[in-house]
């Protein structure tokens, strides 16, 4: 269990005066026939979940992971309400009822969650650049609003998508497990805000042993580097820089990293949700690292992605200290120029790319039966076919 003593939540963390709020808009969609290629184990888990829940609420439904979760829930016959700032017509076509709104608006969140019996809180502001409020408002206040709505509406199952960044302090993470405490010093607002939100989620969990009529059960999952076909983040960035010949490795030695294929990340969320449906869930009130459980060097991972598009492997290296110095200079310049886009290098990225990041996922295996369905090798075949 993670040591939460280094995380504190103050009233300032929840303060937010929103911009003109997005007007809540609901648009329905007819149930569509979805053809997903599901592993027998995933199909079994989905069938079991469909027997326990009838209506799921998914924040960040239009995102890479959120969409994958929605597709599986709909395929299992579970009604899905998706919550996002945009409409996402492709989800409506699948049968997802999309609700447009803002996580920082508690009334919009509560209204959208009416009638649901399980919540997947996937949405977050991710990145390494931007001011504090741009991360804390959606990530911390948004999480608080989701928890409050669950309690107000008596929704008793809440699955939260966290991140391994909550433990990263700029040092190697080699086979760490959930006993590793939150970082003593956070390297960006994203990691800090997600750590606070994760702690809120776990603190909101209520013991199943109580005789109370309503008990909220929560779990947090920490997927690392989600990738696969239609990935809007890692894969396109690697390929774009690879095509320009600007991709470089950071550090003198290869460090191992864990990643997770998109189908595996969605499957882990389904399994955790199913475990929460038990009378005494093993996973409630806990956080879990999840990955493909196949640590590879950063060079190998990048080169496998490049090979999917017929691009040559990356071989050039930049010393970690040089990358860090360049990141510091760029950060200063971007702030002075008030540039909103993310610099191509930051101090955090330099640290991240030169450290190992792989995890002991034994707890996820033991508590809710997770293991990867799709290997990296098979995932790369699917990625190549999609490009």
UniProtKB/Swiss-Prot annotation:
Domain of life: Bacteria
Top EC class for this record: oxidoreductase
EC number, UniProt record: 1.1.1.412
InterPro entries for the chain: 3-beta-HSD-like, 3Beta_OHSteriod_DH/Estase, Lipid_A_modif_metabolic_enz, NAD(P)-bd_dom_sf
Active site: 190
Protein name: 2-alkyl-3-oxoalkanoate reductase
Pfam families: 3Beta_HSD
Gene Ontology molecular-function annotations: oxidoreductase activity, acting on the CH-OH group of donors, NAD or NADP as acceptor
Chain positions recorded as NADP(+) binding sites: 194
Record-stated family: Belongs to the 3-beta-HSD family.
Disruption phenotype: Deletion of the entire oleABCD gene cluster leads to the complete absence of nonpolar extractable products. The oleABCD deletion strain shows a significantly longer lag phase than the wild-type strain when shifted to a lower temperature.
Organism in which the protein naturally occurs: Shewanella oneidensis (strain ATCC 700550 / JCM 31522 / CIP 106686 / LMG 19005 / NCIMB 14063 / MR-1)
Role: Involved in olefin biosynthesis. Catalyzes the reversible stereospecific NADPH-dependent reduction of 2-alkyl-3-oxoalkanoic acids to 2-alkyl-3-hydroxyalkanoic acids. The S.oneidensis oleABCD genes produce 3,6,9,12,15,19,22,25,28-hentriacontanonaene, which may aid the cells in adapting to a sudden drop in temperature.
Biological process, per Gene Ontology: steroid biosynthetic process
Annotated keywords: NADP, Oxidoreductase
Catalytic activity: a (2R,3S)-2-alkyl-3-hydroxyalkanoate + NADP(+) = an (R)-2-alkyl-3-oxoalkanoate + NADPH + H(+)
Upper classification of the organism: Bacteria, Pseudomonadati, Pseudomonadota, Gammaproteobacteria, Alteromonadales
